[in-house]
Amino acid sequence: MIEASKLRAGMTFEAEGKLIRVLEASHHKPGKGNTIMRMKLRDVRTGSTFDTTYRPDEKFEQAIIETVPAQYLYKMDETAYFMNTETYDQYEIPVANVEQELLYILENSDVKIQFYGTEVIGVQVPTTVELTVTETQPSIKGATVTGSGKPATLETGLVVNVPDFIEVGQKLIINTAEGTYVSRA
């Protein structure tokens, strides 16, 4: 059992028969009354997100999530296909369940498949990935790193804000947790 006050982003727990992943969690102390935990959560099975509050001492069953190394193969229609790199088993995951993760991975990228028992519940991508810029505004002469930046579309369709000196065709390192530009590769 885990108390609500110990829940952090990325953790998974069971509540009311649902498997829930914490997206955001914060303590809130109103002017009057007791402290509450404000949370943004996602139902792992349905993909729906919702906001809720809990008392800090409420207890939940922490879900045991196992991960296996895998490779992203391809996407067809509304299904993404992955292969376990140890057993060569293939997994089909609805695109709706891994939509955000697919913005950071290319075909043949290494990932980790997350399991709850025998049920595939998600994909864990590396903390940083290298992607190529496919579309952005032309560079401005004399641009510096301190400028406000410009939007750039990457090869997966992800749009990130980049410094003004970045050009089409350059490889960038992207932070997958924040969805932000880190540096040129």
Swiss-Prot record:
PROSITE patterns: EFP. GO terms for cellular component: cytoplasm. The keyword Protein biosynthesis applies. GO terms for biological process: peptide biosynthetic process. One of its GO terms (molecular function) is translation elongation factor activity. It is found in: Cytoplasm. It holds the Pfam family EFP. It comes from the Bacteria. Its main location: cytoplasm. Keywords: Cytoplasm, Elongation factor, Protein biosynthesis. The keyword Protein biosynthesis applies. Pathway: Protein biosynthesis; polypeptide chain elongation. PANTHER family: ELONGATION FACTOR P, ELONGATION FACTOR P (EF-P) FAMILY PROTEIN. Belongs to the elongation factor P family. Involved in peptide bond synthesis. Stimulates efficient translation and peptide-bond synthesis on native or reconstituted 70S ribosomes in vitro. Probably functions indirectly by altering the affinity of the ribosome for aminoacyl-tRNA, thus increasing their reactivity as acceptors for peptidyl transferase. This is Elongation factor P. It comes from Streptococcus equi subsp. equi (strain 4047).
